[in-house]
């Protein structure tokens, strides 16, 4: 049973449009995402890097524009891991009719470079981060520079950019960062759920209540649908595999076992499970849910396939 909501009082009648947006792609080993043994020796796969736009709020009330994660800058990471088709947030968001300036809130699932590394592209957005995540990375970065060898640092910094911590600290000083402590309703109908010591120190996923029922935007707590369908953690994480299994159970209970309502971090199968289309860049857009009164952004509406199971 999911913990009770805290923060904004009684549950409201809320509704959100939900668009997962790919902003680049990478060719990576399958067992990195699907897990050792089950996906060992299966070669590589092209996976999307995704952030998810949520637009809505209380029905009949103020409407919000929130982004779950914000990608990374097109800097050394692109060359290090061979990312292809990287695009500016302005071009990506424009496909569903929004601009970076419209984003009020960035809900950071965790502080890996591809999830927090481009928040400065959204000048009006406040960041929501779990305090356990911020303190965990602060501690490990300090320890790495004081005590670790270069070989030991390689794993620590394999997906974390210390400069993102510097920029986040500047955001704290400027009042742009809101720290979450555990479970908290951050916007009407959007609740942060702490997944402590799972993918990272203080990862979180977001339960989104709509008129079509709940959805879960989970970041890398669930890389692929197969992780949560088969209860099999991935091959790469900083936390505990057993803790990840507990989080999978919580998500499944929240969604009443309707796994298609999960928005995973890097699964190309999301494009097949939901109404989606291909941009000229080769990146894709999914339209998982439309709030009441909203209209599809897909150029060809005849192929509409929104799944509400």
Q: Which role fits each region the language model picked out?
A:
Residues 2-46, 183-184, 206, 290-307:
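Basic, amphipathic N-terminal segments that precede the first structured/catalytic domain
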Residues 2-6, 73-76, 87-98, 102, 132-194, ...:
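Metallo-beta-lactamase
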Residues 18-20, 51-60, 179-211:
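Core dinuclear metal-dependent hydrolase active-site scaffold
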Residues 25-91, 204-220:
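Conserved beta-strand hairpin/beta-sheet module of binuclear metal-dependent hydrolase folds
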Residues 68, 109, 129-130, 217-220, ...:
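Active-site flanking residues adjacent to catalytic metal/cofactor-binding acidic residues
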Residues 83-129:
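Active-site metal-binding motif and surrounding structural segment of the metallo-beta-lactamase
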Residues 248-309:
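Binuclear metal-ion centers of metallo-dependent hydrolases, dominated by the metallo-beta-lactamase
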């Amino acid at each position: 049973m999911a913990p009770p909501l805290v923060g904004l009082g009684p549950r409201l009648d809320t509704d959100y449009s939900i668009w997962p947006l790919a902003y680049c792609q990478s060719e990576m080993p399958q067992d990195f995402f699907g897990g050792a043994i089950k996906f060992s020796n299966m070669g590589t796969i092209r996976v999307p890097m995704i952030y998810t736009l949520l637009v809505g709020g209380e029905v009949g009330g103020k409407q919000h524009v929130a982004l779950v994660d914000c990608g990374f800058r097109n800097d050394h990471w692109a060359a290090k891991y061979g990312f292809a088709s990287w695009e500016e947030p302005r071009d990506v968001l424009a496909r569903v009719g929004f601009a970076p300036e419209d984003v009020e809130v960035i809900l950071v699932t965790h502080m890996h470079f591809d999830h927090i590394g481009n928040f400065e592209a959204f000048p009006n957005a406040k960041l929501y981060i779990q305090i356990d995540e911020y303190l965990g990375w602060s501690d490990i970065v300090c320890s790495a520079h004081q005590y670790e060898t270069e070989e030991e640092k390689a794993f620590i910094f394999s997906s974390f950019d210390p400069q993102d911590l510097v920029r986040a600290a500047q955001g704290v000083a400027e009042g742009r960062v809101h720290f979450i402590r555990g479970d908290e309703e951050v916007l009407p109908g959007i609740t942060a759920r702490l997944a402590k010591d799972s993918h990272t120190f203080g990862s979180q996923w977001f339960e989104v209540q709509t008129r079509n029922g709940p959805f879960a935007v989970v970041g890398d707590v669930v890389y692929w649908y197969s992780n949560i369908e088969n209860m099999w953690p991935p091959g790469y994480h900083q936390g505990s595999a057993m803790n990840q299994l507990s989080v999978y159970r919580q998500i499944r209970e929240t969604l009443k076992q309707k796994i298609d309502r999960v928005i995973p971090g890097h699964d190309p199968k999301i494009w097949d499970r939901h109404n989606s289309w291909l941009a000229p860049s080769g990146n894709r857009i999914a339209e998982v849910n439309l709030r009441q009164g909203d209209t599809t952004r897909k150029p060809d509406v005849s192929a509409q396939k929104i799944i509400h199971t």
